[in-house]
């Protein structure tokens, strides 16, 4: 009888334990991550869905704004985390080059990670304290049309005229770097500009500086923020080679050069990515980094993630995430 009673009590205890574990699992599932990790093709529709959920979940910690439209009329989204009225602002741009679309997913994972750890410490500093002093402004996807081409081909472009013109250009759709008009958005900026190349997957600067709606929207975006306060630095994410462009020449003021060096050293300490040593004194034509570093006098680093050629396979995301998850918040900590 006693043995049966003990056996019964053991069953009851096991059943209660299973129920408790079930509730715990339910709790974890309810608080599961919004932004996926490790997918090869993080799409524009996923970006929109995730932004909507992040805004709903963290409505007091972030803002989602539309700063303009692409040539094929997709929204260019800005995500502001922290105090929008802060005196200092850090800008982050992803996906200027279409096939480097894993940077969209990386930016979105960073946004969620910082928001979910808002009241915790990263590298010994409370995230909320940093973001109260330095607001971070992300544009996760600067080139949504080009990304759609890289992921789904020319048929992803909705405008018939644009789609027809694209088919006449050279270049593989999956390896596409440019926007929907065949213009490289990283070479379309109003600094030492001169037209070179031809419309296609890569290398074409455009008929004139800021000819593309995406470039104009980004310039307007940074100008607006500069009127609100000081832009302390810019991080631009690309995805080729696990390197960092972090050098600058005497064309930039000493304070800007020093801040850029500190930004590079911070990123290198976390990622292990090496510095690109060559930095020509002659201004590269129409580059975004050239524009901000030398014309706008803003510290700027370009972080190239990934080992292989873009578009990167989903299997690379885990390593990229481990190295880069703290990069942007640590850059903000430099200036708080």
Language-model regions, residue ranges each:
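C-terminal accessory segments enriched in acidic
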Residues: 3-8, 34-40, 193-336
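Bacterial N-terminal signal peptides
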Residues: 11-24
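A non-catalytic alpha/beta surface segment that caps or lines the substrate-entry region
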Residues: 33-79
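Extracytoplasmic/secreted proteins, especially bacterial periplasmic and envelope-associated proteins
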Residues: 42, 46-53, 102-113, 137, ...
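Active-site/substrate-binding loop(s) of hydrolase catalytic cores
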Residues: 102, 109-247, 302-304
